[in-house]
Amino acid sequence: MRKCKNKWGNYYILKMDIAKYFDNINKKILLKIIERKIKDKNILWLIKEILYAQKREKGLEIGNYTSQIFANIYLNEIDQYIKHKLKIRYYFRYMDDSILFLQTKRDAIEALKKIKKYLKENLELELNKKTQIFKDKQGVNFCGYKINENRLKIRDKGK
């Protein structure tokens, strides 16, 4: 945040959350993503067994360790899009929660529009209504912390 302040003065924060993320992961899309990186048929067989051992057609079980790995693999697609196609340098994600720091409100609105489109068309995901754009002065709640340019504070549980 300090880098953004030094570079731009005032800036905007785009905070995003994916709606019902684990429930909405498309296993077919996930498998295609994995198949682009892994070519070994035995490993792919094992991955398919793990994925489809869960009886659900769509979505992953939250408590399963492999689900956490698969969920990160799935969202790596949006990571790459944001960093390399949109060229947004200040982007941070933990599972389905992410924050982006952008120079202007217009930049934030435009980025949000493109990200929504990419998520819907490529990953069949939508952003939660909690998604918001706000000025840097407020700081941001992220991963259990209240973060601003001067400090990092553990957030109260009620907030």
Ranges and model annotations:
Residues M1-M95, I99-K117, L125-K137:
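Conserved polymerase palm-domain catalytic core
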Residues K120:
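Catalytic Cys-His active-site segments of thiol-dependent hydrolases/isopeptidases
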Residues L123-K159:
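A conserved non-catalytic segment of reverse transcriptases
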